[in-house]
Amino acid sequence: SFVEKQVLDSPFTKKEYLNLVKQFNDRQDEIFDDFAISGNTIVNIGNREFVDYRPTIDINSETFINNSVSKINLDSLHYFQIKKMLQNELFKSIVIKKSDIAVNLMLPDLYEDYLQNLTKKNRHELNRKKRKFSDQIDSFELLESKEKEIFDTFVSQHKKSKGEKGKFMTKDTEAYFENLLKLDDWKIYYLKTNKGVVSTAFCYESKKGCYLYNSSRDNKFNSINPGIFLNDLIIQRLIQKGKCFFDFLKGTERYKFDLGGQSVQLYDLYIKL
Protein backbone atom coordinates (compact mmCIF):
# COMPACT_ATOMS: atom_id res chain seq x y z
CA SER A 1 0.00 0.00 0.00
CA PHE A 2 1.01 3.63 -0.38
CA VAL A 3 1.31 4.18 3.37
CA GLU A 4 3.56 1.16 3.63
CA LYS A 5 5.80 2.55 0.89
CA GLN A 6 5.87 5.95 2.56
CA VAL A 7 7.08 4.42 5.84
CA LEU A 8 9.56 2.00 4.27
CA ASP A 9 10.95 4.61 1.83
CA SER A 10 11.42 7.07 4.67
CA PRO A 11 15.00 7.94 5.66
CA PHE A 12 14.57 6.13 8.98
CA THR A 13 14.83 2.67 7.42
CA LYS A 14 18.02 3.36 5.45
CA LYS A 15 21.35 1.77 6.34
CA GLU A 16 23.32 5.03 6.46
CA TYR A 17 20.71 6.60 8.73
CA LEU A 18 20.63 3.63 11.13
CA ASN A 19 24.41 3.74 11.17
CA LEU A 20 24.23 7.32 12.37
CA VAL A 21 21.55 6.86 15.07
CA LYS A 22 23.05 3.76 16.63
CA GLN A 23 25.15 6.19 18.70
CA PHE A 24 21.98 6.71 20.79
CA ASN A 25 21.91 3.03 21.76
CA ASP A 26 23.57 1.65 24.85
CA ARG A 27 27.30 0.96 24.39
CA GLN A 28 26.73 -2.70 25.30
CA ASP A 29 24.04 -3.25 22.67
CA GLU A 30 24.86 -5.55 19.80
CA ILE A 31 23.81 -3.84 16.57
CA PHE A 32 22.41 -5.84 13.64
CA ASP A 33 21.13 -4.55 10.27
CA ASP A 34 17.81 -3.12 11.41
CA PHE A 35 17.56 -3.96 15.10
CA ALA A 36 19.78 -4.22 18.17
CA ILE A 37 20.00 -6.70 21.02
CA SER A 38 20.20 -5.26 24.50
CA GLY A 39 20.81 -7.97 27.10
CA ASN A 40 18.22 -10.59 26.17
CA THR A 41 15.86 -8.18 24.39
CA ILE A 42 15.52 -7.19 20.75
CA VAL A 43 15.12 -3.40 20.53
CA ASN A 44 15.12 -0.70 17.87
CA ILE A 45 18.23 1.10 16.68
CA GLY A 46 18.17 4.73 17.77
CA ASN A 47 16.09 6.61 20.33
CA ARG A 48 12.39 7.11 19.55
CA GLU A 49 12.80 10.85 20.23
CA PHE A 50 14.91 11.06 17.07
CA VAL A 51 13.52 8.23 14.94
CA ASP A 52 10.01 8.71 13.56
CA TYR A 53 9.41 5.46 11.67
CA ARG A 54 11.01 2.02 11.92
CA PRO A 55 12.11 -0.60 9.42
CA THR A 56 10.00 -3.77 9.33
CA ILE A 57 12.13 -6.27 11.18
CA ASP A 58 12.46 -9.82 9.91
CA ILE A 59 13.63 -11.97 12.80
CA ASN A 60 14.16 -15.71 12.54
CA SER A 61 14.35 -18.29 15.30
CA GLU A 62 18.10 -18.65 14.72
CA THR A 63 18.60 -15.07 15.95
CA PHE A 64 16.60 -15.88 19.09
CA ILE A 65 18.57 -19.03 19.86
CA ASN A 66 22.05 -17.68 19.05
CA ASN A 67 21.54 -14.61 21.22
CA SER A 68 19.35 -16.19 23.95
CA VAL A 69 16.66 -13.63 23.24
CA SER A 70 13.55 -13.84 25.44
CA LYS A 71 11.82 -10.51 24.69
CA ILE A 72 11.15 -8.07 21.87
CA ASN A 73 10.41 -4.41 22.67
CA LEU A 74 9.81 -2.21 19.63
CA ASP A 75 8.36 1.28 19.29
CA SER A 76 6.90 3.61 16.64
CA LEU A 77 5.51 0.85 14.44
CA HIS A 78 2.82 1.30 11.85
CA TYR A 79 -0.25 -0.95 11.85
CA PHE A 80 0.95 -2.96 8.81
CA GLN A 81 4.22 -3.72 10.65
CA ILE A 82 2.38 -4.97 13.72
CA LYS A 83 0.26 -7.25 11.50
CA LYS A 84 3.39 -8.70 9.93
CA MET A 85 5.07 -9.34 13.30
CA LEU A 86 1.96 -11.13 14.58
CA GLN A 87 2.25 -13.77 11.85
CA ASN A 88 5.08 -15.30 13.87
CA GLU A 89 4.06 -18.47 15.72
CA LEU A 90 6.85 -18.41 18.31
CA PHE A 91 5.47 -15.82 20.69
CA LYS A 92 4.17 -16.56 24.20
CA SER A 93 2.60 -13.20 24.91
CA ILE A 94 2.04 -10.01 22.96
CA VAL A 95 1.12 -6.52 24.15
CA ILE A 96 0.32 -3.81 21.60
CA LYS A 97 0.13 -0.27 22.92
CA LYS A 98 -0.90 2.93 21.16
CA SER A 99 2.04 5.32 21.27
CA ASP A 100 3.15 8.31 19.21
CA ILE A 101 1.02 10.00 16.60
CA ALA A 102 2.47 11.19 13.31
CA VAL A 103 0.70 13.66 11.02
CA ASN A 104 0.67 13.28 7.25
CA LEU A 105 -0.58 15.47 4.40
CA MET A 106 -1.42 13.91 1.03
CA LEU A 107 -0.87 16.40 -1.80
CA PRO A 108 -3.22 16.88 -4.76
CA ASP A 109 -2.01 17.86 -8.27
CA LEU A 110 -2.89 21.54 -7.88
CA TYR A 111 -2.34 24.04 -5.08
CA GLU A 112 -5.89 25.36 -5.66
CA ASP A 113 -7.20 21.89 -4.86
CA TYR A 114 -5.06 21.80 -1.72
CA LEU A 115 -6.70 25.03 -0.53
CA GLN A 116 -10.15 23.69 -1.39
CA ASN A 117 -9.45 20.54 0.65
CA LEU A 118 -8.83 22.59 3.80
CA THR A 119 -11.79 23.25 6.07
CA LYS A 120 -13.35 26.67 5.55
CA LYS A 121 -11.99 27.81 8.93
CA ASN A 122 -8.44 26.61 8.21
CA ARG A 123 -8.45 28.15 4.73
CA HIS A 124 -9.58 31.48 6.18
CA GLU A 125 -6.91 31.29 8.93
CA LEU A 126 -4.15 30.45 6.46
CA ASN A 127 -5.05 33.42 4.26
CA ARG A 128 -5.16 35.70 7.27
CA LYS A 129 -1.72 34.56 8.46
CA LYS A 130 -0.24 34.93 4.98
CA ARG A 131 -1.61 38.47 4.66
CA LYS A 132 -0.21 39.38 8.07
CA PHE A 133 3.21 38.09 7.03
CA SER A 134 3.17 39.91 3.67
CA ASP A 135 2.15 43.16 5.38
CA GLN A 136 5.36 43.13 7.45
CA ILE A 137 7.80 41.58 4.98
CA ASP A 138 8.57 43.33 1.69
CA SER A 139 10.34 40.53 -0.15
CA PHE A 140 10.77 36.83 0.48
CA GLU A 141 12.07 33.73 -1.26
CA LEU A 142 11.93 30.00 -0.55
CA LEU A 143 15.42 28.52 -0.88
CA GLU A 144 17.02 25.16 -0.10
CA SER A 145 20.55 24.33 0.95
CA LYS A 146 22.98 21.82 2.44
CA GLU A 147 25.51 24.55 3.27
CA LYS A 148 27.13 25.16 6.66
CA GLU A 149 25.93 28.77 6.77
CA ILE A 150 22.26 27.79 6.74
CA PHE A 151 22.90 24.90 9.11
CA ASP A 152 24.41 27.39 11.58
CA THR A 153 21.29 29.56 11.28
CA PHE A 154 19.10 26.52 12.00
CA VAL A 155 21.19 25.69 15.11
CA SER A 156 21.36 29.23 16.48
CA GLN A 157 17.59 29.76 16.03
CA HIS A 158 17.10 26.57 18.07
CA LYS A 159 19.45 27.71 20.81
CA LYS A 160 17.71 31.07 21.11
CA SER A 161 14.29 29.43 21.56
CA LYS A 162 12.54 29.60 24.90
CA GLY A 163 11.79 26.61 27.14
CA GLU A 164 12.29 23.00 26.04
CA LYS A 165 13.07 23.85 22.43
CA GLY A 166 16.01 25.98 23.58
CA LYS A 167 17.49 23.04 25.51
CA PHE A 168 17.12 20.61 22.63
CA MET A 169 20.23 21.58 20.65
CA THR A 170 23.02 20.11 22.77
CA LYS A 171 26.53 19.58 21.38
CA ASP A 172 25.72 15.94 20.55
CA THR A 173 22.42 16.81 18.90
CA GLU A 174 24.10 19.49 16.81
CA ALA A 175 26.76 17.00 15.64
CA TYR A 176 24.00 14.50 14.79
CA PHE A 177 22.10 17.04 12.65
CA GLU A 178 25.33 18.12 10.97
CA ASN A 179 26.07 14.51 9.98
CA LEU A 180 22.49 14.01 8.87
CA LEU A 181 22.72 16.93 6.46
CA LYS A 182 25.71 15.25 4.79
CA LEU A 183 23.59 12.22 3.83
CA ASP A 184 21.84 12.10 0.44
CA ASP A 185 18.45 13.81 0.07
CA TRP A 186 18.56 15.70 3.38
CA LYS A 187 18.37 19.49 3.09
CA ILE A 188 17.21 22.65 4.76
CA TYR A 189 14.41 24.69 3.22
CA TYR A 190 14.54 28.26 4.44
CA LEU A 191 12.61 31.49 4.10
CA LYS A 192 14.93 34.31 3.13
CA THR A 193 13.46 37.80 3.49
CA ASN A 194 14.57 41.44 3.45
CA LYS A 195 14.78 41.02 7.26
CA GLY A 196 17.02 37.93 7.13
CA VAL A 197 16.23 34.21 7.38
CA VAL A 198 13.02 34.00 9.43
CA SER A 199 12.41 30.24 9.45
CA THR A 200 13.93 26.92 8.39
CA ALA A 201 12.69 23.37 7.79
CA PHE A 202 15.09 20.43 8.06
CA CYS A 203 13.74 17.88 5.56
CA TYR A 204 14.34 14.62 3.76
CA GLU A 205 12.99 14.66 0.22
CA SER A 206 12.45 11.49 -1.78
CA LYS A 207 11.11 11.00 -5.30
CA LYS A 208 7.60 10.67 -3.93
CA GLY A 209 7.43 13.24 -1.15
CA CYS A 210 8.99 15.17 1.68
CA TYR A 211 9.46 14.40 5.40
CA LEU A 212 9.61 17.41 7.73
CA TYR A 213 12.07 16.30 10.40
CA ASN A 214 12.70 19.50 12.35
CA SER A 215 12.31 23.25 12.07
CA SER A 216 13.41 26.55 13.55
CA ARG A 217 12.40 30.17 13.42
CA ASP A 218 13.59 33.60 14.41
CA ASN A 219 11.51 34.32 17.52
CA LYS A 220 11.49 38.06 16.79
CA PHE A 221 8.98 37.27 14.04
CA ASN A 222 6.70 34.87 15.95
CA SER A 223 3.77 37.27 15.70
CA ILE A 224 3.70 36.92 11.90
CA ASN A 225 3.89 33.09 11.80
CA PRO A 226 7.09 32.55 9.80
CA GLY A 227 6.78 28.77 10.24
CA ILE A 228 3.31 28.55 8.71
CA PHE A 229 4.35 30.83 5.86
CA LEU A 230 7.38 28.65 5.13
CA ASN A 231 5.37 25.42 5.24
CA ASP A 232 2.79 26.86 2.86
CA LEU A 233 5.56 27.75 0.39
CA ILE A 234 7.05 24.26 0.73
CA ILE A 235 3.61 22.73 0.04
CA GLN A 236 3.34 24.86 -3.13
CA ARG A 237 6.85 23.83 -4.20
CA LEU A 238 6.20 20.12 -3.55
CA ILE A 239 2.98 20.24 -5.58
CA GLN A 240 4.88 21.93 -8.46
CA LYS A 241 7.46 19.13 -8.29
CA GLY A 242 4.68 16.53 -8.51
CA LYS A 243 5.27 15.09 -5.02
CA CYS A 244 2.50 13.01 -3.40
CA PHE A 245 2.87 13.82 0.29
CA PHE A 246 4.30 16.13 2.93
CA ASP A 247 4.85 14.02 6.05
CA PHE A 248 4.97 16.12 9.24
CA LEU A 249 6.16 13.03 11.16
CA LYS A 250 5.73 12.56 14.94
CA GLY A 251 4.11 15.13 17.18
CA THR A 252 0.63 16.63 17.25
CA GLU A 253 1.46 20.34 17.03
CA ARG A 254 -1.61 22.28 15.98
CA TYR A 255 -0.12 23.83 12.84
CA LYS A 256 0.12 20.37 11.22
CA PHE A 257 -3.64 19.93 11.43
CA ASP A 258 -4.28 23.57 10.47
CA LEU A 259 -2.40 22.84 7.23
CA GLY A 260 -4.66 19.86 6.51
CA GLY A 261 -2.60 17.00 7.98
CA GLN A 262 -4.26 13.77 9.13
CA SER A 263 -3.16 11.85 12.20
CA VAL A 264 -1.47 8.46 11.88
CA GLN A 265 -1.43 6.22 14.95
CA LEU A 266 1.84 4.44 15.76
CA TYR A 267 2.20 1.50 18.15
CA ASP A 268 4.66 -0.03 20.60
CA LEU A 269 5.03 -3.80 20.68
CA TYR A 270 6.09 -5.92 23.68
CA ILE A 271 6.60 -9.61 23.03
CA LYS A 272 7.68 -12.48 25.30
CA LEU A 273 9.09 -15.60 23.69
Segments (PLM) and residue ranges:
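A conserved beta-strand-loop-helix scaffold within acyl/acetyltransferase catalytic domains
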Residues: 1-45, 85-102, 109-223
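Acyl-donor binding region in acyl/amide transferases
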Residues: 4-5, 37-97, 207-263
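Short, surface-exposed, charged/polar-biased interaction segments
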Residues: 53, 124, 172-175, 179, ...
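Conserved catalytic-core motifs of GNAT/GCN5-like acyltransferases
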Residues: 98-102, 263-273
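Non-catalytic surface loops within mature trypsin-like serine protease
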Residues: 107-109, 273
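Secondary-structure boundary/capping residues
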Residues: 138, 186, 243, 264-265
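Short secondary-structure capping/turn micro-motifs that flank functional sites
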Residues: 149, 254-255, 272-273
